[in-house]
């Protein structure tokens, strides 16, 4: 357990120590978030730096590799490549998205097709690494069993990575909301990984949780910095790949139900407006609807965190 706590501490310390410097640098370079004018009044947040995910992702990656090398040798470093690559690759995609938004001073960054291409290429590389490391292309489906997908495994891998990275991206709309929920979901998978004796995923998760806890010090309401797409895409990709590596991908639908609800609210809102020219919710993603009802960011955060925690505890008891 001590090696895991050291992993958490390393990522936490790196994030807490260097985040003030990143905030100062981003403010001086005027790399600040562009706040959408639609929906709840968030214009008071204009000028808040974005791309905070850059630091906690980097801190988590460094801590994870150090932990893998220190306690498992070269085999630990090699095994850590898959989850860390997924985390970093999608952070880079999100970083490009954030950078383009800042350069263009607009809410739209990476165009849809280039962004999807980048996500697809990342999935190809991840699958290639998995093949080189001998990870079986099998999928466990509840009530059916384990099936060998062969090359069709790529389709599932791509869908899972793109789907969950975008789901967490949609959830990142309030100070502390995604970071707090991600801590809970990663903690749940840490318990699952411990039960499966998967020490690599445990180390990886402790590293991410450490980085996120450090980030929350600066991201809680009223946030001094946002994680941006750099962090939100990375967190979803990290959860997607580790659920696959643990052999329980569909459990993420339960543990990440908050992310699913957020995504469904956007889909339902879009379909409703397209076909009936009516909005089903006051605003989507659904966390903004709570704002419309007069809830504060802290109240919404706490509600979502509590729901995630209940789901996590129930899921852990069921799986164990």
Curated annotation (Swiss-Prot):
<keyword id="KW-0472">Membrane</keyword>
<feature type="transmembrane region" description="Helical">
    <location>
        <begin position="198"/>
        <end position="218"/>
    </location>
</feature>
<keyword id="KW-0812">Transmembrane</keyword>
<comment type="pathway">
    <text>Cell wall biogenesis; peptidoglycan biosynthesis.</text>
</comment>
<feature type="transmembrane region" description="Helical">
    <location>
        <begin position="233"/>
        <end position="255"/>
    </location>
</feature>
<keyword id="KW-0479">Metal-binding</keyword>
<dbReference type="GO" id="GO:0008360">
    <property type="term" value="P:regulation of cell shape"/>
</dbReference>
<comment type="function">
    <text>Catalyzes the initial step of the lipid cycle reactions in the biosynthesis of the cell wall peptidoglycan: transfers peptidoglycan precursor phospho-MurNAc-pentapeptide from UDP-MurNAc-pentapeptide onto the lipid carrier undecaprenyl phosphate, yielding undecaprenyl-pyrophosphoryl-MurNAc-pentapeptide, known as lipid I.</text>
</comment>
<dbReference type="GO" id="GO:0071555">
    <property type="term" value="P:cell wall organization"/>
</dbReference>
<dbReference type="GO" id="GO:0005886">
    <property type="term" value="C:plasma membrane"/>
</dbReference>
<keyword id="KW-0460">Magnesium</keyword>
<dbReference type="InterPro" id="IPR000715">
    <property type="entry name" value="Glycosyl_transferase_4"/>
</dbReference>
<feature type="transmembrane region" description="Helical">
    <location>
        <begin position="145"/>
        <end position="165"/>
    </location>
</feature>
<dbReference type="GO" id="GO:0046872">
    <property type="term" value="F:metal ion binding"/>
</dbReference>
<keyword id="KW-1133">Transmembrane helix</keyword>
<keyword id="KW-1003">Cell membrane</keyword>
<feature type="transmembrane region" description="Helical">
    <location>
        <begin position="298"/>
        <end position="318"/>
    </location>
</feature>
<dbReference type="GO" id="GO:0008963">
    <property type="term" value="F:phospho-N-acetylmuramoyl-pentapeptide-transferase activity"/>
</dbReference>
<dbReference type="GO" id="GO:0009252">
    <property type="term" value="P:peptidoglycan biosynthetic process"/>
</dbReference>
<keyword id="KW-0131">Cell cycle</keyword>
<comment type="similarity">
    <text>Belongs to the glycosyltransferase 4 family. MraY subfamily.</text>
</comment>
<dbReference type="Pfam" id="PF00953">
    <property type="entry name" value="Glycos_transf_4"/>
</dbReference>
<feature type="transmembrane region" description="Helical">
    <location>
        <begin position="51"/>
        <end position="71"/>
    </location>
</feature>
<keyword id="KW-0573">Peptidoglycan synthesis</keyword>
<feature type="transmembrane region" description="Helical">
    <location>
        <begin position="76"/>
        <end position="96"/>
    </location>
</feature>
<feature type="transmembrane region" description="Helical">
    <location>
        <begin position="176"/>
        <end position="196"/>
    </location>
</feature>
<dbReference type="InterPro" id="IPR003524">
    <property type="entry name" value="PNAcMuramoyl-5peptid_Trfase"/>
</dbReference>
<protein>
    <recommendedName>
        <fullName>Phospho-N-acetylmuramoyl-pentapeptide-transferase</fullName>
        <ecNumber>2.7.8.13</ecNumber>
    </recommendedName>
</protein>
<dbReference type="GO" id="GO:0051301">
    <property type="term" value="P:cell division"/>
</dbReference>
<keyword id="KW-0132">Cell division</keyword>
<keyword id="KW-0961">Cell wall biogenesis/degradation</keyword>
<feature type="transmembrane region" description="Helical">
    <location>
        <begin position="124"/>
        <end position="144"/>
    </location>
</feature>
<dbReference type="Pfam" id="PF10555">
    <property type="entry name" value="MraY_sig1"/>
</dbReference>
<feature type="transmembrane region" description="Helical">
    <location>
        <begin position="5"/>
        <end position="25"/>
    </location>
</feature>
<keyword id="KW-0133">Cell shape</keyword>
<dbReference type="InterPro" id="IPR018480">
    <property type="entry name" value="PNAcMuramoyl-5peptid_Trfase_CS"/>
</dbReference>
<keyword id="KW-0808">Transferase</keyword>
């Amino acid at each position: 357990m001590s090696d895991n706590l050291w992993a958490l501490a390393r990522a936490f310390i790196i994030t807490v120590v260097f985040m003030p410097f990143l905030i100062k640098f981003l403010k001086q370079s005027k790399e600040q978030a562009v706040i959408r004018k639609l929906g709840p009044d968030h214009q008071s947040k204009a000028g808040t730096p974005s791309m905070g995910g850059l630091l906690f992702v980097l801190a988590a990656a460094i801590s994870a590799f150090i932990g893998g090398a220190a306690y498992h040798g070269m085999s630990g470093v090699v095994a850590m490549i898959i989850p860390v690559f997924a985390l970093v690759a999608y952070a880079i995609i999100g970083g490009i998205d954030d950078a383009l938004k800042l350069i263009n001073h607009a809410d739209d960054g990476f165009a849809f097709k280039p962004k999807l291409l980048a996500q697809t290429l990342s999935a190809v590389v991840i699958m290639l690494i998995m093949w080189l490391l001998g990870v079986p292309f099998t999928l466990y489906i509840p009530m059916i069993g384990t099936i060998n997908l062969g090359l069709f495994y790529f389709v599932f891998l791509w869908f899972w990575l793109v789907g969950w990275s975008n789901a967490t991206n949609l959830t990142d709309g309030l100070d502390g909301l995604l970071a707090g929920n991600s801590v809970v979901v990663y903690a749940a998978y840490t318990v699952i990984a411990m039960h499966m004796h998967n020490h690599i995923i445990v180390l990886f998760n402790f590293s991410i949780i450490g980085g996120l806890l450090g980030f929350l010090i600066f991201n809680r309401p009223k946030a001094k910095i946002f994680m941006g797409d750099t962090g939100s895409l990375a967190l979803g990709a990290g959860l997607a790949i580790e659920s696959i590596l643990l052999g329980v991908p569909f459990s993420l639908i339960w543990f990440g139900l908050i992310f699913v609800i957020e995504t469904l609210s956007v889909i339902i809102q879009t379909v409703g407006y397209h076909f009936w020219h009516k909005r089903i919710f006051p605003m989507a993603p659904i966390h903004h609807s709570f704002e419309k009802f007069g809830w504060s960011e802290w109240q919404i955060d706490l509600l979502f965190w509590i729901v995630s925690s209940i789901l996590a505890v129930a899921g852990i008891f069921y799986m164990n």
